[in-house]
Amino acid sequence: MFKRLMMVALLVIAPLSAATAADQTNPYKLMDEAAQKTFDRLKNEQPQIRANPDYLRTIVDQELLPYVQVKYAGALVLGQYYKSATPAQRDAYFAAFREYLKQAYGQALAMYHGQTYQIAPEQPLGDKTIVPIRVTIIDPNGRPPVRLDFQWRKNSQTGNWQAYYMIAE
């Protein structure tokens, strides 16, 4: 269960206006910035989080979702049904999908208790448009590390990198 919760938590970290400060052309820097900002807020804002667990949704919305390509990820979930949906149905779906991500990641982040993370060393990007980045979550209480492999995609419209998929081991 811990792995599952950390998996969801780090998708939020991957990935998601916080993204504007980092180098948008480097997914490794974006990954590091998202993780650092999220973990810093989790550490520093525990009183607010304990008083109102829904506050985690705010952290997710502000620190993680700017790094996530929500529409692309949501379209992948819809699969073949994406093309048959009307624009109004798509808009409603993406709004609901975004709220789902905030809720799911917020619940996962509620499990934060001093974990640290390590991001894999940067690799040359070349002409790649999809890049895997491994993040390892280290628990101070000696639990086995959790490996998270994020897929970052170069947005074909903006040229910026955003996370859209994650696998946990």
Could you tell me what each predicted segment is?
Residues 16-23:
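Sec/Tat signal peptide C-region and signal peptidase I cleavage site
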